[in-house]
Every structure is written in C-alpha cells, then in structure tokens.
Amino acid sequence: MIPLAAWEEVIDASGVAPRIEAMLPIGVRRRQLSVRTLLAGLCLAQADHRPAHLTRAHRALTALPEQDQARLGVVTAWKDGPHLLTYRQTERTFGLIADALAKDEPDGLPSAALAGICDDLLEASIPAEFKDASRSLAVDWTDLETFSRPPPAKGGECADPEASWGHRKNNLPGPKDELFFGHYASAGIMMPDEGGRPLPELARRATLSSCRHDPARALVPVLTAMPAAGIPLGDILADSGYAHRDADAWALPLRAAGAALVQDLHPHDRGPKGTHHGAVIANGSLYCPNTPRSLLELGPLSRDAAPEAVTAHDARAAELARYKLGRITADDPDGYHRIQCPAAMGKIRCPLRPASMTLDRGRPEILQPPQHPQECCTQQTITVPPEITAKTAQKHNYPSKAHRRSYARRTGAERGFATAKDPASNNITRGWCRLMSLTPLMLSITCLLVVRNQRILAAWYTRQAENQRRAAAGLSPKTRKRRRKTLASLATRPP
C-alpha cells in the first residue's frame, strides 16, 4: 500500500490546503480536522481500494498509528482528555469545503476555484522528472452515475439537482446504448511525444460536468488554461466524438492555444466535402481537382487488417498525398495560409504545369486536365481562409501511416479510465460516491486520479528496476504477450 507520506507530499506540493482553509468560515472553536488531513484521508481510503465514502476516510484516519494521529490532529487534547476525531466532524469539514468551492448558482459545471484546486492536485502528483517529458495528451470522457435517483416522471426535484440524463455504451450482452443519470468525467492522460521516450501514463487534467453539458466543450477551458500555467500544449489525441464537434467548440480554441490535433474523423466528415477555388476539400486537406475519387474516399484501416491489407492501404495513402496541395506559409494572425498546386511542387505531372512534365514517370500523371481550369490550376498559389478546414485539419494527413501510428497513442485515455474503473480496485459505478452534487463528486474523482497516478508510478519504477536487472543479466526487457483474439485468428489457429 502507498504510504501516508506520499499523499502528504502531493497535498503539500499542490498548495491547495492553505487556499481552501482561507475560504472556510471561522467559528468560535477551532476545527479539529484540517483540510490537509481530510484530503489525506480521502486518498488513503481510495488507495486501499475503498469507495469514496466519508465513513471510509474517517476509518482510514482513525486507523493510523498513534504518532501520525497526533501529528495530523486526528487525536487532540481537550479539557476532558484526548479526543478522537468523530465522523460528524469529518462530515462537517467536508461539507464546508464543498460549500466553499461550489457555485452560488449551480449550473452543472465546476467553479473556477474548484477547477484550480483539482488541477493543482493532479499536477502535484506528477514527479518533476516527467513534467517536461511530454506535451501530448490523450483525452476521453466516461460516465459517472450519481447516487441520486432520477427525478419523478411526473416532475419534481431529485437529491442531485445538477445531474442529468446522459448516454453511454456498454460491453454487456444485449443493447449497447443506454441512458444513465449523472455526470460526464473527462480526463487528459500524458502520452509520449512522437519519437519520444516512454513515460508513465499519468492523468494530468480532469473535469466533471453535468450530462446537460457537452463534455468536449467542458474540457476545452481546462486544456486551454494549461499554457498560462507554464505547460505548453502539444499533440491532443481524441476520437471522432471530439472531432465531430463544431470547430468553434473544439478545434479552433485548441489550435489557438498551440495544440496540434491528432484525431479520428467522424464518418460524416470523411471524404470529399466541397471545393475551394477548384481544389477538393477532403479529410482536412485540399487536393487536386483530378484526384481519383477512390483515393479521396479512402477510409481508415480496420484494427484487425491483415499485413497485406496494411501495405496496400499505406501505398494508396502515399499516392493520395501526392495530389495534396502543399502548404508554403504558416498561418498569419488571422488564420490564413497559402498553398500550392502539387504539380508546381513537383509531386505529380500535369500538362497545365509544363515544367512538371519533365519529371520522371514514377509520379502520378494527370491525363485529362480540366478544359476550364480554376484558380488552383492557373495561379501559383491560393489563399485558404481558416474556416475552410477549421473542423477537420490536423497534424498528419488522414488516413496516412503517420497518422495511424500517432493516433495509436490515444488508447492511453482508455487505459486511464480502465485503471480507475477496475472492479478489483475502485469501481466508480453507482454508489461509489454517495455525496450529492458536482463539487463533492469532482473532489472524489480527482483524489481517485491522484491515487491512480501513484499506482502507475509505483508499477513504472518496479518495471524499470526489473528491466535494469534483466539488462545486467544480458536479457531483453520483459514484454506482455498480445492477447487480443479475432475470429480470423481463432479460425486459423492450429488445434
């Protein structure tokens, strides 16, 4: 089990305890339970694979050694003798914290104070050696069902007025889509940069929002606030659920904050989607008007594709890249940039660009150029406004080999929630936290992610020590056997 000193170090490094104490009301009698001790108790309870119940936190604090109890104020000297912390005191202190961090008029989103407290706690759980090791984040959201019952069908209030109906998918037999009553929990997990060294997949940012709010829009202010905190944004790895949002809601604010998007496009956003000065808009890029339709409609590779299919797909993606109009300038302050015909750049042969016809015949050739060429074929360059590919433009050509390899890192977000939702440890199903409203839930989920980070770090250091031992013995690092099974692999497996 992770020792108490580890939680105290994280809480002290974050600096959140004094800030919260300053927000709490001051009574006639000094509170026995401090914010620092309560946060340590919440982490201790969840580190012991317990639910986020205040009774569990109280039990964890009262089970500490006598020396730690005296040091943390769990046992204090009253005029009648030593006094052991009671559950009522624990509940009272947590209630004061929740009231201080909540909004005056709850709307299903965290207050600025609550968001800052949770950000600082998560940032403090990341060791200094990994803070600058990567700027890439894999993002995702998951369901967090409230303990409250839904409001009556005939109308009326419920115990958790900030909760709302949401949609989730399950892996159980039967229907895959279902409704739940609660909130969406979003998180950003640190992933290695492209070509960077491996590092532990630590949760760096998280937020909670009612299901009446879009989780993608709720996560944007959390990510865009990171540069102001001295954490520059790098690659943001997201699935099509994020990429399908309006550009103003997701892509544009992240690009303005310095992020590079690496995401899967929604099926409705793939393929040709109009033209700009004659150039075909497809998959976030502009292509020659004579690009073969089959290349423009090239989709992503299936997960269980055979090696021959992978090779053929990569060859077609590389051929498609030759028809792409190349960028020759960076974005100006208004988001405009200029691109050039692929024949003028020497990527294909086209009669409309006589100089390109001197290139070798290994390049694709336009056999039937348009009789009435448009600006993309007659001008040296064309200007692209920011709104043309605002929603779908990203770091790599889609769906190229480079994009597939870079996007493969996004599974870290799935693993992040899988470790936090493991039934063998902390299962955040309904009843995991019985406190109502968004503020107590967000504090609890943040403490859980801090605990998860410490578990990941402990496993990381153990694995590195084992790899060093094996290297000293002349052995290669130990790897895990791939256990994913497909119908094709099962059918061809020998008996």
Feature-to-residue mapping (PLM):
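Structural motif
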Residues: 26-37, 176-178, 408, 433-442
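Short amphipathic alpha-helical "interface-anchor" segments enriched in bulky aromatics
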Residues: 277-340, 386-436
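Short amphipathic alpha-helical segments and their helix-coil junctions
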Residues: 9-28, 163-166, 398, 425-433
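Basic, amphipathic alpha-helical segments enriched in Lys/Arg and hydrophobic/aromatic residues
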Residues: 405-489
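Short, charged, surface-exposed secondary-structure boundary motifs
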Residues: 270-278
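Polybasic low-complexity intrinsically disordered regions
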Residues: 30-39, 56-60, 88-258, 262-269
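Dynamic "connector" segments at or just before major functional cores
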Residues: 1-53, 66-122, 463-466, 471, ...
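Long, low-complexity, polar/charged, intrinsically disordered or flexibly structured peripheral segments
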Residues: 148, 163, 328-399
